């Protein structure tokens, strides 16, 4: 845990185990102390009231030690609660990757090199699983193309392999939803 004090790069999470059987997590970053930082608007550079006021002290940084669930995983997801008093970011990855990792670990509750390789190569999309269930509830109104899409999605195993018809249909619809929703 103390080794992280001297290692800091943007967005790095360190998960460790020690010789006493402890497992832990620490962010290996220097978090600047910033006033009014909880949004993405640019700040006027000539106004010193927005200057950084140093960095969050190591002993006030978030950490995790020996969680009850028995393992620690991160996947660029939000790793801190809303009660953490310093602003880190409001740009976190979707929780779908961490949910998938946690699901795989919980299903096995053991690890070895082969299992770690399997997790690294896993192509199952937790996000697609959530979204496709909603898409399949939509009505086609007799549209042949929509019926074909429904059929492909209803048979899809949520594996996003390069040759997957289900992945192609899902991403086409998902991108159209984003474009039609946000422009």
Predicted regions and their residues:
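Alpha/propeptide regions of enzymes that mature by internal proteolysis
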Residues: 1-8
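Long, compositionally biased non-active-site segments enriched in small/hydrophobic residues and glycine
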Residues: 18-183
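Segments that shape or occlude catalytic/ligand-binding pockets
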Residues: 11
């Amino acid at each position: 845990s103390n080794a992280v004090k001297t290692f800091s790069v943007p967005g790095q999470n360190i998960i460790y185990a020690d010789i006493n059987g402890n497992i832990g997590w620490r962010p290996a970053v220097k978090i600047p102390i910033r006033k009014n930082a909880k949004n993405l608007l640019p700040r006027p550079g000539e106004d010193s009231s927005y200057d950084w006021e140093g960095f969050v002290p190591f002993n006030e940084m978030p950490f995790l030690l020996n969680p009850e669930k028995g393992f620690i995983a991160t996947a660029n997801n939000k790793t801190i609660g809303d009660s953490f008093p310093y602003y880190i970011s409001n740009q976190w990855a979707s929780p779908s990757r961490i949910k998938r990792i946690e699901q795989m670990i919980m299903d096995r509750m053991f690890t070895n090199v082969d299992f770690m390789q399997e997790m690294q190569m896993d192509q199952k999309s937790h996000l697609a699983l959530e979204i496709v269930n909603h898409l399949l509830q939509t009505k086609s109104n007799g549209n042949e193309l929509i019926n074909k899409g429904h059929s492909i999605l209803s048979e899809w195993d949520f594996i996003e392999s390069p040759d997957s018809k289900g992945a192609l249909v899902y991403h086409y619809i998902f991108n159209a939803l984003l474009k039609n929703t946000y422009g």
